[in-house]
From Swiss-Prot:
One of its GO terms (biological process) is valyl-tRNA aminoacylation. A motif ('HIGH' region) lies at residues 46-56. It is an enzyme of class 6 (ligase). A motif ('KMSKS' region) lies at residues 583-587. Its EC number is 6.1.1.9. It comes from the Bacteria. This is Valine--tRNA ligase. Catalyzes the attachment of valine to tRNA(Val). As ValRS can inadvertently accommodate and process structurally similar amino acids such as threonine, to avoid such errors, it has a 'posttransfer' editing activity that hydrolyzes mischarged Thr-tRNA(Val) in a tRNA-dependent manner. GO terms for cellular component: cytosol. InterPro entries: aa-tRNA-synth_I_CS, aa-tRNA-synth_Ia, Anticodon_Ia_Val, M/V/L/I-tRNA-synth_anticd-bd, Rossmann-like_a/b/a_fold, RPE1, tRNAsynth_Ia_anticodon-bd, Val/Leu/Ile-tRNA-synth_edit. Keywords: Aminoacyl-tRNA synthetase, ATP-binding, Cytoplasm, Ligase, Nucleotide-binding, Protein biosynthesis. It comes from Rickettsia felis (strain ATCC VR-1525 / URRWXCal2).
Amino acid sequence: MKEFPKNYNFTENEKKWQQIWQEKQIYAYDPNISKDEIYVVDTPPPTVSGQLHIGHVYSYTQTDFIVRFQRMMGKNIFYPMGFDDNGLPTERLVEKQKQIKAYNMSRSEFIKICEEVVASEEEKFRSLFNQIALSVDWSLEYQTISPLSRKISQMSFLDLVKKGEVYRNDQPILWDPVDGTALAQADIDDKEKTSFMNYITFEIEEDDRPFSKFAYREEFVGNTEHSTAAYIKVREDASTGLTHKLPLEVEFGKRSITIATTRPELLPACVAVFYHPDDKRYKHLAGKSAITPLFNGKVPLLADPLVQQDKGTGLVMCCTFGDQTDITWWKTHNLPLKTIVTKKGTIDFPHDIAIDGLKIKEARTKIIDILKEQNLLTKQEEITHTVKCAERSGAPLEILTVPQWFVKTISHKEALLKRASELNWHPKNMKIRLESWINSISWDWCISRQRYFGVPFPVWYSKRVGEEGKILYADISQLPVDPLKDLPIGYSKEEVEPDLDVMDTWATSSVSPQLSTHGISDDFTVNKERHDKLFPMELRPQAHEIIRTWAFYTILKAHLHQNTLPWKNIMVSGWCLAEDRSKMSKSKGNVLVPEKLLEQYGSDVIRYWSANSKLGADTAYSEDVMKNGKRLVNKLWNAAKFVSIHFEKLKDKDKQAKLLDVKEKITNEFDQWMINKLVELVKLATNELQNYEYANAMHLTEKFFWAIFCDNYLEISKNRAYDEENKNPSGQYSSILTLYHTMQILLKLFAPFMPHITEELYQILYSDKSVHEKGNWVNYGDLNYKIDAKGAEGLLEILDIVRKFKAEKNLSIKAPIKLLEVSGIELSAELTEDLKNVTSAEEIQFEDQGDKIKVNVIL
């Protein structure tokens, strides 16, 4: 045993151990060990899009609890760290940090700046991850923009092309006008926004018959009647059956209808007006045409069951495109395409109504003003409705028709639901989120982005005569390729047009397992032996808000590539909230910076706070929990320091032996009860960790440490451990062995959660080897002392009564007692002696009265 330092300095010790762990490669993966001994983790590659916050620490440390446990259980851990350092999130960081815009410079110049920024940011990430003691093997690090990752990502694309699961199409897609790129369904947020429902008058194509422009469903019975003064609408009284004729003010020779819309700026793109086929108000419109106000476009009046009869007037204009229903109608009814919105979110429609070049909101305001001037806007209603916005920029999305690459998704929904059920979910209720997302999918996955810093498509388009537009794919031997610099085999630069788009960043991070295993499928692999050994993986840890993206896309890719799941287990963490349980945000000023907390409390305390939250639960940051963690670190130090003074009395061979091998030397009844409780704790904590319930394991261990070990066992066994008069040598040795092995086992149980303090104490007290080494979990065999636990538990109950008595009398805990009269139980001689010592009682008398323990204290 080493000399015990006077105090524990967490700042110095945490830095010391972090450096030693790296130097000694404590966390290194061994590629030579068999597959069945490997535990492979698909670590979340943090997006290089800004500063890491306490929420990252919260989720990453929870993964590390499980990884450290599995390593100590004897698993060969494959625990990489990646960086998702390409795509729109990274571009936005670079533009903000450098105060530049990608479209104002050359592509190559912008990419170079991106590479410089991500290199700097990733170094900050590494530093923080080391400070919070993530036990990753840094030799397995990857970047999603590296040449190898680009190669594997392009392999994924080509494999899906070969399998017929990828296609290119000129079809309506979601478009972010701020970032100037197509987006996938998973990249959007539904936001509640205030707007106006505008009731606009459309004319019906002129003819001879008059028509009531006001007809409501509850009032309409049949055709309206002629009148030289006014039109008549007919209403039937349901209670009497009588028909009432009501005069209306109308214009002769013209018929009109009213539609309600939130997007009047799309009037030039109107291609039809729809009503529900069961709506009696509008059945007479079948086969007719309407004239769009201001722009005089003739559009058909059509029936479709998707119309909501009770929304607005029950008449809906179909524009190309305002929403997904417009797309459905456009396809179903073979309607023409009128595109008036540009990629920059402006109107492209030269007309007497001067809206050309205006932004969407500006055009909307101008159209409404003109409609009012011409009495074509009958009313406006303020409403709150859901608007689809870009997750990153926050901009309301447009729907444009731009050629894009898609992965077939809708056709696989049933198979993906089955995959979700095959996966082991921790916690189980998170599966519902994936199932709900899969059921809601209505678009194939658009994987192309009109950006710059990303993985390029290995694609060119032929300009050769006779095959113009033919898609040319790179050969696997060419990967990774940049179509702007490289050429397809057999073609010259003049004969091809490169694909300028880059892949959705999720298209690369969705193969994060394969970025580590170095393979995609049997046909596309960099290292087949490595891939087959590591894939499918054991664990995917991630946060719940990216179930619809990262989890879903990774499952989809593995299903399409190899007809399998990418991992066996998924553990889903919750959010870290502010102390008032509100969401952390920069605008609120309540974002916690990990570096400041590390300086104040140290890594072990922060990890303790993280371990106090159940998996999947959203948890508020708590200063009280942090203080409890600091108190626990100090108590571990002091308890270890206290018990260490006795260890020199043990024989060296007994120090080196396993607990099972010295069980015969633990002879005292209370010591044996203590070891039995310890073995029970190990079984429970091990089971909880095997089921990813780290919080339960931490709670059980902490409760045992405070309540059983510190508050009771240390006090009860203290006299025997000292035994200054050498009255009970076997009892003394028994207690010291119990202290020795209990402290050692507790350090191992705490090690996954608080790695620094446990390493420091373990190496002072027990070994030069790391407590975190592979296979160093508790091995107790079939250890179990055949004793009646009622005796030791009775001792504790009596002690509790005596402590309360002394507290009520304001007496010192060491205050002497002349006599304890105890009824309801009789203790053995060994337990009686321990009870006398801990209560400072001169004498204890047992009386056989009843089953309930009662104690009479005589001072």
